[in-house]
Amino acid sequence: MIPFLDLRQINMRYQKEIQQAMNRVLESGWYILGGEVDDFERKFASYCGAKYCIGVANGLDALTLIIRAYDIGLGDEVIVPSNTYIASILAISANGATPVLVEPDINTYNIDPLKIEEKITSRTKAIMVVHLYGQSCDMESINLIAKKYNLKVIEDCAQAHGAIYNGKRVGSLGDAAGFSFYPGKNLGALGDGGAITTNDAELAERLNVLRNYGSHKKYENLFKGVNSRLDELQAAILSIKLSYLDDDNQRRREIAAYYLEHIKNPFIHLPTVTDDKAHVWHLFVVRVKEREAFQYYLAEQNIQTLIHYPIPPHKQKAYSEWQQESFPISEQIHSEVVSLPISPVMSREEVERVVEAVNRYGY
Protein backbone atom coordinates (compact mmCIF):
# COMPACT_ATOMS: atom_id res chain seq x y z
CA MET A 1 0.00 0.00 0.00
CA ILE A 2 1.24 3.47 -0.89
CA PRO A 3 0.09 5.56 2.09
CA PHE A 4 -1.32 9.02 1.62
CA LEU A 5 1.19 10.33 4.19
CA ASP A 6 3.65 8.23 6.21
CA LEU A 7 4.20 10.34 9.33
CA ARG A 8 6.35 7.70 10.99
CA GLN A 9 8.80 7.68 8.10
CA ILE A 10 8.80 11.47 7.91
CA ASN A 11 9.65 11.92 11.58
CA MET A 12 12.04 9.00 11.98
CA ARG A 13 14.46 10.90 9.73
CA TYR A 14 15.01 13.24 12.68
CA GLN A 15 14.86 10.63 15.43
CA LYS A 16 18.28 11.32 16.93
CA GLU A 17 17.88 15.11 16.89
CA ILE A 18 14.37 14.92 18.31
CA GLN A 19 15.38 12.61 21.14
CA GLN A 20 18.28 14.91 22.02
CA ALA A 21 15.93 17.90 22.04
CA MET A 22 13.38 16.09 24.21
CA ASN A 23 16.09 15.13 26.69
CA ARG A 24 17.26 18.74 26.76
CA VAL A 25 13.77 19.97 27.58
CA LEU A 26 13.21 17.24 30.16
CA GLU A 27 16.44 18.06 31.93
CA SER A 28 15.75 21.80 31.88
CA GLY A 29 12.78 21.48 34.22
CA TRP A 30 10.94 24.24 32.29
CA TYR A 31 8.13 23.11 30.01
CA ILE A 32 5.90 26.10 29.18
CA LEU A 33 6.94 29.43 27.57
CA GLY A 34 10.67 29.00 28.03
CA GLY A 35 13.81 29.24 25.96
CA GLU A 36 12.76 26.66 23.36
CA VAL A 37 9.61 28.63 22.53
CA ASP A 38 11.57 31.89 22.40
CA ASP A 39 14.12 30.29 20.08
CA PHE A 40 11.51 28.86 17.73
CA GLU A 41 9.54 32.10 17.65
CA ARG A 42 12.67 33.99 16.59
CA LYS A 43 13.56 31.44 13.92
CA PHE A 44 10.06 31.18 12.49
CA ALA A 45 9.52 34.94 12.40
CA SER A 46 12.79 35.31 10.52
CA TYR A 47 11.89 32.47 8.15
CA CYS A 48 8.55 34.07 7.29
CA GLY A 49 10.04 37.54 6.94
CA ALA A 50 7.98 38.86 9.85
CA LYS A 51 9.12 40.83 12.88
CA TYR A 52 7.18 38.85 15.47
CA CYS A 53 6.01 35.30 16.09
CA ILE A 54 3.73 34.19 18.92
CA GLY A 55 3.51 30.45 19.57
CA VAL A 56 0.05 29.13 20.46
CA ALA A 57 -1.65 25.79 21.04
CA ASN A 58 -3.00 25.17 17.53
CA GLY A 59 -3.95 26.75 14.23
CA LEU A 60 -7.57 27.45 15.17
CA ASP A 61 -6.44 29.35 18.26
CA ALA A 62 -4.00 31.33 16.12
CA LEU A 63 -6.79 32.65 13.90
CA THR A 64 -9.24 33.08 16.79
CA LEU A 65 -6.75 35.14 18.80
CA ILE A 66 -5.86 37.38 15.85
CA ILE A 67 -9.52 38.28 15.40
CA ARG A 68 -9.94 38.80 19.13
CA ALA A 69 -6.84 40.99 19.34
CA TYR A 70 -8.31 43.23 16.65
CA ASP A 71 -11.53 43.58 18.70
CA ILE A 72 -13.58 42.09 15.88
CA GLY A 73 -16.78 40.70 17.35
CA LEU A 74 -20.55 40.90 17.58
CA GLY A 75 -22.02 42.91 14.72
CA ASP A 76 -18.83 42.75 12.65
CA GLU A 77 -18.24 40.78 9.46
CA VAL A 78 -15.17 38.98 8.13
CA ILE A 79 -14.79 37.94 4.49
CA VAL A 80 -13.65 34.31 4.17
CA PRO A 81 -13.51 31.78 1.30
CA SER A 82 -16.49 29.45 0.95
CA ASN A 83 -14.37 26.35 0.25
CA THR A 84 -11.95 26.43 3.16
CA TYR A 85 -11.50 24.00 6.05
CA ILE A 86 -14.04 24.76 8.76
CA ALA A 87 -11.41 26.11 11.20
CA SER A 88 -11.09 29.35 9.22
CA ILE A 89 -14.80 29.99 9.74
CA LEU A 90 -14.94 28.75 13.33
CA ALA A 91 -12.33 31.34 14.31
CA ILE A 92 -14.66 34.10 13.14
CA SER A 93 -17.75 32.62 14.80
CA ALA A 94 -15.90 32.06 18.07
CA ASN A 95 -15.50 35.82 18.39
CA GLY A 96 -19.18 36.52 17.74
CA ALA A 97 -18.49 37.99 14.31
CA THR A 98 -20.26 36.92 11.12
CA PRO A 99 -18.38 34.97 8.43
CA VAL A 100 -19.24 36.23 4.94
CA LEU A 101 -18.50 33.54 2.37
CA VAL A 102 -16.89 34.35 -0.98
CA GLU A 103 -16.54 31.82 -3.80
CA PRO A 104 -13.10 30.64 -4.99
CA ASP A 105 -11.44 30.77 -8.36
CA ILE A 106 -12.32 27.44 -10.00
CA ASN A 107 -8.73 27.00 -11.22
CA THR A 108 -6.61 27.86 -8.16
CA TYR A 109 -9.26 27.01 -5.51
CA ASN A 110 -8.23 30.18 -3.65
CA ILE A 111 -10.60 33.05 -2.89
CA ASP A 112 -11.51 35.00 -6.04
CA PRO A 113 -10.51 38.67 -5.59
CA LEU A 114 -13.06 39.68 -8.23
CA LYS A 115 -15.87 38.48 -5.95
CA ILE A 116 -14.72 40.08 -2.70
CA GLU A 117 -15.77 43.69 -3.19
CA GLU A 118 -19.45 42.90 -3.75
CA LYS A 119 -19.58 41.22 -0.31
CA ILE A 120 -18.10 44.17 1.61
CA THR A 121 -20.51 46.17 3.79
CA SER A 122 -20.22 48.87 6.44
CA ARG A 123 -19.83 46.05 8.98
CA THR A 124 -16.86 44.38 7.27
CA LYS A 125 -13.69 44.56 9.37
CA ALA A 126 -11.31 42.07 7.76
CA ILE A 127 -10.58 39.74 4.87
CA MET A 128 -9.31 36.29 5.80
CA VAL A 129 -7.41 34.63 2.97
CA VAL A 130 -6.60 30.92 2.96
CA HIS A 131 -3.56 29.78 0.98
CA LEU A 132 -5.24 26.51 0.12
CA TYR A 133 -3.29 23.32 -0.64
CA GLY A 134 0.04 25.20 -0.53
CA GLN A 135 -0.46 27.96 -3.10
CA SER A 136 -0.61 31.63 -2.16
CA CYS A 137 -3.68 33.72 -2.90
CA ASP A 138 -3.55 36.74 -5.22
CA MET A 139 -2.35 39.00 -2.42
CA GLU A 140 -1.66 42.06 -4.54
CA SER A 141 -5.30 42.33 -5.58
CA ILE A 142 -6.60 41.47 -2.12
CA ASN A 143 -4.37 43.99 -0.34
CA LEU A 144 -5.51 46.71 -2.74
CA ILE A 145 -9.14 45.97 -1.87
CA ALA A 146 -8.33 45.93 1.84
CA LYS A 147 -6.56 49.27 1.60
CA LYS A 148 -9.48 50.81 -0.30
CA TYR A 149 -11.94 49.85 2.46
CA ASN A 150 -9.54 50.09 5.43
CA LEU A 151 -9.79 46.38 6.25
CA LYS A 152 -7.38 44.07 8.04
CA VAL A 153 -5.93 41.17 6.04
CA ILE A 154 -5.58 37.92 7.99
CA GLU A 155 -3.70 35.03 6.39
CA ASP A 156 -4.63 31.43 7.13
CA CYS A 157 -1.32 29.73 6.36
CA ALA A 158 -2.16 26.31 7.79
CA GLN A 159 -1.42 24.60 4.45
CA ALA A 160 1.30 26.84 3.09
CA HIS A 161 4.42 26.86 5.29
CA GLY A 162 7.17 28.34 3.12
CA ALA A 163 4.98 29.30 0.15
CA ILE A 164 6.08 32.45 -1.67
CA TYR A 165 4.25 35.31 -3.38
CA ASN A 166 6.18 37.96 -5.30
CA GLY A 167 9.39 37.09 -3.47
CA LYS A 168 7.88 37.15 0.04
CA ARG A 169 6.82 34.20 2.15
CA VAL A 170 3.28 33.76 3.36
CA GLY A 171 2.98 34.96 6.92
CA SER A 172 4.31 38.37 5.92
CA LEU A 173 1.78 39.30 3.22
CA GLY A 174 -1.04 40.72 5.36
CA ASP A 175 -1.53 42.28 8.79
CA ALA A 176 -1.28 39.00 10.69
CA ALA A 177 -1.11 35.30 9.88
CA GLY A 178 -2.10 32.08 11.61
CA PHE A 179 -0.21 28.80 11.19
CA SER A 180 -1.03 25.26 12.25
CA PHE A 181 1.65 22.71 13.14
CA TYR A 182 -0.70 19.73 13.13
CA PRO A 183 1.47 16.63 12.48
CA GLY A 184 0.42 16.26 8.84
CA LYS A 185 1.41 19.81 7.84
CA ASN A 186 4.53 20.61 5.81
CA LEU A 187 5.97 21.81 9.12
CA GLY A 188 4.34 19.50 11.64
CA ALA A 189 4.81 18.98 15.36
CA LEU A 190 4.46 15.68 17.22
CA GLY A 191 1.10 16.86 18.51
CA ASP A 192 -0.84 20.08 18.19
CA GLY A 193 0.79 23.48 17.83
CA GLY A 194 0.31 26.81 16.14
CA ALA A 195 1.77 30.28 15.68
CA ILE A 196 0.92 33.83 14.70
CA THR A 197 3.23 36.07 12.68
CA THR A 198 2.92 39.83 12.29
CA ASN A 199 4.91 43.02 11.80
CA ASP A 200 2.66 44.93 14.21
CA ALA A 201 4.43 45.40 17.55
CA GLU A 202 1.28 46.45 19.41
CA LEU A 203 -0.66 43.47 18.09
CA ALA A 204 2.17 41.08 18.99
CA GLU A 205 2.29 42.43 22.54
CA ARG A 206 -1.44 41.99 22.95
CA LEU A 207 -1.34 38.45 21.54
CA ASN A 208 1.46 37.49 23.93
CA VAL A 209 -0.82 38.52 26.78
CA LEU A 210 -4.05 37.02 25.38
CA ARG A 211 -2.52 33.55 24.88
CA ASN A 212 -1.51 33.44 28.55
CA TYR A 213 -4.80 34.07 30.39
CA GLY A 214 -4.63 37.76 29.50
CA SER A 215 -1.73 38.07 31.93
CA HIS A 216 1.21 40.39 31.33
CA LYS A 217 2.61 39.69 34.78
CA LYS A 218 1.99 36.67 36.99
CA TYR A 219 -1.38 36.91 38.73
CA GLU A 220 -2.17 40.22 37.01
CA ASN A 221 -4.61 40.14 34.08
CA LEU A 222 -5.05 42.94 31.55
CA PHE A 223 -7.60 41.06 29.42
CA LYS A 224 -9.95 38.09 29.63
CA GLY A 225 -7.49 35.82 27.89
CA VAL A 226 -7.18 32.12 27.16
CA ASN A 227 -4.70 29.34 27.79
CA SER A 228 -3.17 28.74 24.35
CA ARG A 229 0.56 28.22 24.57
CA LEU A 230 3.02 26.33 22.41
CA ASP A 231 4.89 24.01 24.79
CA GLU A 232 8.65 23.63 25.05
CA LEU A 233 8.76 20.09 23.64
CA GLN A 234 6.86 20.96 20.49
CA ALA A 235 8.86 24.16 20.02
CA ALA A 236 12.13 22.24 20.25
CA ILE A 237 10.91 19.69 17.70
CA LEU A 238 9.64 22.39 15.35
CA SER A 239 13.00 24.17 15.44
CA ILE A 240 14.64 20.98 14.19
CA LYS A 241 12.09 20.39 11.44
CA LEU A 242 12.13 24.04 10.34
CA SER A 243 15.75 23.62 9.23
CA TYR A 244 14.61 20.91 6.78
CA LEU A 245 11.42 22.59 5.57
CA ASP A 246 12.80 24.09 2.36
CA ASP A 247 14.34 20.77 1.31
CA ASP A 248 11.08 18.95 2.04
CA ASN A 249 9.07 21.53 0.11
CA GLN A 250 11.44 21.16 -2.84
CA ARG A 251 10.89 17.39 -2.85
CA ARG A 252 7.14 18.03 -2.86
CA ARG A 253 7.60 20.32 -5.89
CA GLU A 254 9.56 17.62 -7.71
CA ILE A 255 6.80 15.06 -7.13
CA ALA A 256 4.11 17.54 -8.15
CA ALA A 257 6.04 18.42 -11.31
CA TYR A 258 6.27 14.71 -12.19
CA TYR A 259 2.54 14.28 -11.65
CA LEU A 260 1.74 17.35 -13.75
CA GLU A 261 3.97 16.20 -16.60
CA HIS A 262 3.09 12.52 -16.67
CA ILE A 263 -0.56 12.24 -15.63
CA LYS A 264 -2.42 12.22 -18.92
CA ASN A 265 -5.99 11.14 -18.49
CA PRO A 266 -9.02 13.04 -19.85
CA PHE A 267 -11.07 11.96 -16.82
CA ILE A 268 -8.66 13.74 -14.43
CA HIS A 269 -8.56 17.52 -13.98
CA LEU A 270 -5.09 18.54 -12.78
CA PRO A 271 -4.39 21.52 -10.48
CA THR A 272 -3.54 24.93 -11.90
CA VAL A 273 -0.22 26.42 -10.80
CA THR A 274 0.42 30.17 -10.84
CA ASP A 275 4.12 29.84 -9.88
CA ASP A 276 5.69 26.39 -9.72
CA LYS A 277 8.66 27.65 -7.68
CA ALA A 278 6.44 29.21 -5.01
CA HIS A 279 3.86 26.44 -4.45
CA VAL A 280 4.69 24.12 -1.52
CA TRP A 281 2.19 21.37 -2.40
CA HIS A 282 0.79 20.53 0.99
CA LEU A 283 -1.76 18.63 -1.05
CA PHE A 284 -1.89 17.51 -4.67
CA VAL A 285 -5.57 17.76 -5.47
CA VAL A 286 -7.18 16.56 -8.69
CA ARG A 287 -10.84 16.71 -9.70
CA VAL A 288 -12.77 13.68 -10.92
CA LYS A 289 -16.46 13.52 -11.84
CA GLU A 290 -16.92 9.96 -10.55
CA ARG A 291 -14.95 10.44 -7.36
CA GLU A 292 -16.09 7.36 -5.45
CA ALA A 293 -15.29 5.09 -8.37
CA PHE A 294 -11.86 6.71 -8.74
CA GLN A 295 -11.03 6.28 -5.05
CA TYR A 296 -12.26 2.69 -5.09
CA TYR A 297 -10.15 1.95 -8.16
CA LEU A 298 -6.98 3.41 -6.59
CA ALA A 299 -7.62 1.55 -3.33
CA GLU A 300 -7.69 -1.67 -5.34
CA GLN A 301 -4.30 -0.62 -6.73
CA ASN A 302 -3.09 -0.24 -3.12
CA ILE A 303 -2.93 3.56 -3.32
CA GLN A 304 -4.48 5.56 -0.49
CA THR A 305 -6.27 8.82 -1.30
CA LEU A 306 -8.16 11.35 0.83
CA ILE A 307 -10.72 14.09 0.22
CA HIS A 308 -10.01 17.71 1.21
CA TYR A 309 -12.86 18.37 1.81
CA PRO A 310 -16.06 16.37 1.22
CA ILE A 311 -18.60 18.85 2.65
CA PRO A 312 -18.45 22.62 1.98
CA PRO A 313 -18.85 24.83 5.08
CA HIS A 314 -22.29 26.11 4.08
CA LYS A 315 -23.58 22.52 4.04
CA GLN A 316 -22.34 21.69 7.54
CA LYS A 317 -24.99 21.20 10.24
CA ALA A 318 -23.10 23.60 12.49
CA TYR A 319 -23.95 26.37 10.02
CA SER A 320 -27.54 25.43 9.22
CA GLU A 321 -28.35 29.11 8.61
CA TRP A 322 -26.46 28.79 5.30
CA GLN A 323 -28.22 25.63 4.11
CA GLN A 324 -30.36 27.49 1.59
CA GLU A 325 -27.53 29.61 0.20
CA SER A 326 -25.94 28.72 -3.12
CA PHE A 327 -22.20 28.46 -3.70
CA PRO A 328 -22.06 26.45 -6.94
CA ILE A 329 -18.30 26.64 -7.49
CA SER A 330 -17.56 25.46 -3.95
CA GLU A 331 -20.14 22.71 -4.29
CA GLN A 332 -18.57 21.51 -7.53
CA ILE A 333 -15.08 21.54 -6.03
CA HIS A 334 -16.14 19.69 -2.89
CA SER A 335 -17.95 17.04 -4.93
CA GLU A 336 -14.99 16.30 -7.21
CA VAL A 337 -11.69 16.80 -5.33
CA VAL A 338 -9.38 13.91 -4.52
CA SER A 339 -5.94 14.24 -2.92
CA LEU A 340 -3.21 11.97 -4.29
CA PRO A 341 -0.27 10.86 -2.13
CA ILE A 342 2.49 13.46 -1.88
CA SER A 343 5.20 13.75 0.74
CA PRO A 344 8.97 14.28 0.95
CA VAL A 345 9.55 10.60 1.76
CA MET A 346 7.79 9.13 -1.27
CA SER A 347 10.12 7.07 -3.43
CA ARG A 348 10.45 7.49 -7.21
CA GLU A 349 8.93 4.04 -7.62
CA GLU A 350 5.87 5.01 -5.55
CA VAL A 351 5.38 8.22 -7.55
CA GLU A 352 5.62 6.29 -10.82
CA ARG A 353 3.11 3.70 -9.57
CA VAL A 354 0.62 6.46 -8.73
CA VAL A 355 0.99 7.96 -12.21
CA GLU A 356 0.61 4.60 -13.94
CA ALA A 357 -2.50 3.76 -11.94
CA VAL A 358 -4.11 7.16 -12.50
CA ASN A 359 -3.44 6.98 -16.23
CA ARG A 360 -5.15 3.58 -16.47
CA TYR A 361 -8.30 4.81 -14.72
CA GLY A 362 -11.41 4.72 -16.91
CA TYR A 363 -9.94 2.53 -19.63
UniProtKB/Swiss-Prot annotation:
The modification N6-(pyridoxal phosphate)lysine is found at K185. SUPFAM superfamilies: PLP-dependent transferases. It catalyses: dTDP-3-amino-3,6-dideoxy-alpha-D-galactopyranose + 2-oxoglutarate = dTDP-3-dehydro-6-deoxy-alpha-D-galactose + L-glutamate. Keywords: Pyridoxal phosphate, Transferase. It holds the Pfam family DegT_DnrJ_EryC1. The keyword Repressor does not apply. Gene3D superfamilies: Aspartate Aminotransferase, domain 1, Type I PLP-dependent aspartate aminotransferase-like (Major domain). Its cofactor is pyridoxal 5'-phosphate. InterPro entries: DegT/StrS_aminotransferase, PyrdxlP-dep_Trfase, PyrdxlP-dep_Trfase_major, PyrdxlP-dep_Trfase_small. Its EC number is 2.6.1.90. One of its GO terms (molecular function) is transaminase activity. GO terms for biological process: polysaccharide biosynthetic process. PANTHER family: 3-OXO-GLUCOSE-6-PHOSPHATE:GLUTAMATE AMINOTRANSFERASE (PTHR30244:SF36), TRANSAMINASE (PTHR30244). Specifically aminates dTDP-6-deoxy-D-xylohex-3-ulose to form dTDP-D-Fucp3N in the biosynthesis of dTDP-3-acetamido-3,6-dideoxy-alpha-D-galactose, a glycan chain of the S-layer. Belongs to the DegT/DnrJ/EryC1 family. This is dTDP-3-amino-3,6-dideoxy-alpha-D-galactopyranose transaminase. It comes from Aneurinibacillus thermoaerophilus. The lineage of its organism: Bacteria, Bacillati, Bacillota, Bacilli, Bacillales. The gene is fdtB.
